[in-house]
Curated annotation (Swiss-Prot):
This is Alkyldihydroxyacetonephosphate synthase. Belongs to the FAD-binding oxidoreductase/transferase type 4 family. One of its GO terms (cellular component) is peroxisome. It is found in: Peroxisome.
């Protein structure tokens, strides 16, 4: 079993970046080369940042932008709001090591891992850290914690792996009077039961991705949920954010994997029934995607998959993203569903090759011979080509049959197979994007992501419109920047569009541009019938659009459900939903207060939060 299951994970991973302490993309000053976490040089990355991101001519050197030290950041922590009677009673039911009031524990439980989070913590812009970190060992501990929190009106913020990128784990800064505790679930990482005949297993939800599969592999099973955050995120986090993994085409999204759960709410424990199919109202659906706003999920029954006999991942090139999209849509209509099918637009394709450490593959892509073949023989525009990675898992017969059908479709659209090397490289590097983001952040760049889910009718139009809106924001601000997109997670009716964007960082005003990008993109995505997020969760980043997305009646129904389970609003306030109405408050006054207490347009903007406190 991974040692992180018997020690406290937050003491081993970075407080100001992604992953374990000491693991990062380094910069070799002598050779002027970024060095990947695998020790290999990323020979084309700086050229990409110069040509595609900044679009500058002449000599180009990156500049390190070191953040605060841990000691300096700790000095910036506001003093805690400690409700002593709550702490005293908590000490009677939990052991000493489960209650952390120290500064480092507080520092490591403030933020998630998006650009805005890390930009602020690296600069000591800390508005509302938790006042204590509590580490339950089991479900019963969670019940005791919640009962006391309800009794003493203490705010509870669930914390899994801390990998959230929409503000889901950050305490609400408008909680200036109530004590806020962060519940770190990672001690709860055990598999409690497995039913190999039915194909189910019961886990505590603080279990990390690798530890789920390590425990299941002893029985010849796996879960099949493989998000980018896999190594550091938890089952509870996946449930809370309505997560999706890279292999969702075959194994499903998290809501397809959860069969039952235990939830500790302020008014009692909810246990959803375990059966082959729900009847009536599906209570599981009420808690998946709820981000701790209704209570604390402690245990979950998940469906499990046999370890595949065969795994084959390979790369293809198409003349354009539009052609690749039509090809994969054709596959979907024909019922051809590979485990993974990721289509990169022309910009994301260039980033994929530029960030690679596979010298053979990259050299081939950038070689004159290859370019001549693409331009002369294939008749393609090199600047428009689209990389596609597909994966097949299952029995040998299943994968061969599925691949044969897919090859027929792809070749009909003129695609060129690159073999298994790109697929294997993607498998090895698929968790690396956050390290690239951290490298950018440490060298005067900013980088982040957003995503949506759209119908096929709207997908290409939405892709074009989002990229156009990004270019317009940059032009309005006199900045150069880059945006790329890939699509994955294909469904019968639509797919996910996942955008990555990078720009040069000058000063704190760049965060205002960052927010302009997100606002403009959100408007465009909603205009094209996109949703607020495919798998990142609502957090506080998407709360401003929840009423528009759900409708007034829909949002009111969700808020009344929360009120029934959480009458004092102690469960992760400020996330998922606007602030609840107060007694005797007029609708107009409620709307005005909700706007004042929206975190989206205030966090990290100098003076914005203070003006509304």
């Amino acid at each position: 079993m991974d040692k992180r299951m018997i020690t406290d994970a937050f003491e081993e991973i970075k407080w100001n970046g992604w992953g374990d302490t000491g693991v990062c993309i380094k910069y070799d000053e002598a050779r002027q080369l970024p060095i990947h976490t695998n020790g290999k040089p990323m020979k084309h990355l700086l050229k990409f940042m110069k040509d595609d991101v900044l679009k500058v001519k002449g000599e180009f050197k990156i500049k390190p932008t070191p953040g605060l030290t841990k000691e300096e950041a700790i000095k910036r922590l506001p003093p805690p709001v400690v409700k002593q009677p709550f702490v005293d009673e908590l000490r009677q039911v939990l052991s000493k090591d489960q209650i952390r009031l120290d500064a480092y524990a507080r520092l490591t439980h403030i933020f998630g891992k998006n650009y805005r989070d890390l930009w602020r913590v690296r600069r000591g812009m800390i508005d509302r850290p938790p006042d204590a970190v509590i580490l339950p060992n089991n479900h019963d501990d969670c019940v005791k914690i919640m009962e006391l929190a309800q009794k003493h009106n203490v705010v509870v913020v669930p914390f899994g792996g801390g990998t959230n990128v929409t503000g889901g784990v950050e305490p609400n800064p408008f909680e200036t009077r109530r004590m806020v505790i962060s519940i770190d679930m990672r001690r709860m990482g055990r598999m409690l039961h497995i039913d190999t005949e039915s194909g189910t297993a019961v886990f505590e939800v603080g279990v990390l991705g690798p530890d789920i599969d390590e425990q299941l592999s002893r029985y010849g099973f796996m879960m099949g949920h493989d998000p980018d955050s896999y190594a550091y995120s938890t089952l509870g986090g996946w449930i809370a954010a309505r997560g999706s993994g890279a292999m969702s085409n075959k194994y499903g999204d998290i809501e397809n994997m959860i069969l039952a759960m235990r939830v500790v709410t302020p008014v009692g424990v909810v246990e959803t029934p375990l059966t082959s199919r729900p009847c009536g109202v599906d209570l599981n659906a009420m808690f998946v995607g709820s981000e701790g706003a209704f209570g604390l999920v402690t245990e979950a029954v998940v469906k499990i998959e046999r370890l595949p006999e065969v795994k084959r991942y390979e790369g293809w090139l198409f003349p354009s993203f539009e052609v690749a999209f039509t090809a994969f849509h054709t596959c979907t209509r024909k019922g051809i569903h590979p485990c993974t099918m990721r289509l990169y637009d022309e910009d994301d394709t260039r980033l994929s090759f530029a960030a690679s450490t596979d010298s053979g593959l990259v050299s081939t892509f950038f070689s004159k011979c290859f370019k001549k073949y693409i331009a002369t023989v294939k008749g393609w525009n090199l600047s428009k080509i689209s990389l596609v990675v597909v994966g097949f898992e299952g029995t040998k017969a299943q994968t061969n049959c599925q691949r044969s059908e897919l090859v027929g479709v792809f070749q009909a659209f003129g695609a060129t197979c690159l073999g298994t090397k790109p697929g294997n490289t993607w498998q090895e590097k698929k968790y690396d994007l956050p390290y690239l983001r951290d490298f950018a952040l440490a060298h005067n760049f900013w980088a982040d992501v957003f995503e949506t889910s759209v119908l096929y009718t709207d997908a290409i139009h939405c892709w074009r419109a989002v990229k156009k809106s990004f270019a317009e924001v940059m032009a309005e601000n006199g900045k150069n920047a880059w945006i790329g997109c890939h699509t994955a997670h294909q469904y019968r009716f639509g797919c996910c569009l996942y955008f990555t964007f990078i720009g040069g960082q000058a000063d704190e005003n760049d965060l205002k541009i960052f927010l302009q990008v997100k606002k403009r993109a959100m408007e465009v995505m909603l205009q094209h019938r996109g949703n607020l997020t495919h798998h990142h969760g609502i957090g506080y980043e998407h709360v401003p659009w929840m009423k528009r997305y759900n409708g007034e009646g829909g949002l009111d129904a969700i808020m009344k459900f929360k009120k029934a389970l959480d009458p004092k609003n102690i469960c992760n306030p400020g996330k998922l939903l606007p602030s609840p109405p107060s007694e005797k408050e007029t609708p107009k006054a409620t709307q005005a207060r909700q706007n004042r207490e929206m975190m989206f347009d205030k966090m990290g903007i100098p003076g914005a939060l203070q003006a509304h406190l």
